[in-house]
Amino acid sequence: MGYKLLLMYIAIVIDSVIGTAEVMSHVTAHFGKALEECRDESGLSPEILNEFKHFWSEDFDVVHRELGCAIICMSNKFSLLKDDTRIHHVNMHDYVKSFPNGEVLSAKMVNLIHNCEKQYDDITDECDRVVKVAACFKVDAKKEGIAPEVAMIEAVIEKY
């Protein structure tokens, strides 16, 4: 009996992780649509712009200051930041919840971003700080098992 219960628990945990990664693929695909609009404003080179679609891959380094500027611009398109360029918790919760099954990811995503923001709060340049927060979030999301595979993003990108 205990063995069956353990297997059921493992299946639920795996389903939950896959579910949150799937939601993250929707969030990433939708959020990424604003990148082209923000390219000129942020000074993002065409090379980095092209690489951004691989944000979640191991090969993509989240290091360029211009990427931080682009993320600020993109976030502002969806009202996800406060005036001090820190996460707007309520708006981010609402944004993530707007996707299918978003409620399973919302709190975890906001918490991870907020914890990363605290680590880099002393950086005064907004673009530098935001790119550090994004890199931290990518690492932590992978640790938590909520980072989507690139194929998952490609599968849903046409919806947005």
UniProtKB/Swiss-Prot annotation:
Q: What is this protein called?
A: General odorant-binding protein 2
What's this protein's family per the entry?
Belongs to the PBP/GOBP family.
What positions belong to coiled-coil segments? none
Q: Which SMART domains match?
A: PhBP
Q: Which UniProt keywords apply?
A: Disulfide bond, Olfaction, Sensory transduction, Signal, Transport
A Gene Ontology biological process noted in the UniProt record is: sensory perception of smell
Q: In which tissues is it expressed?
A: Antenna.
Disulfide bond annotation, renumbered to this chain: 38-73, 69-127, 116-136
Signal sequence coordinates: 1-19
Q: Could you state a single Gene Ontology molecular function term?
A: odorant binding
The UniProt entry, under InterPro entries, shows: Odorant/phero-bd_Lep, PBP/GOBP, PBP_GOBP_sf
What this protein is reported to do is described as: Present in the aqueous fluid surrounding olfactory sensory dendrites and are thought to aid in the capture and transport of hydrophobic odorants into and through this fluid.
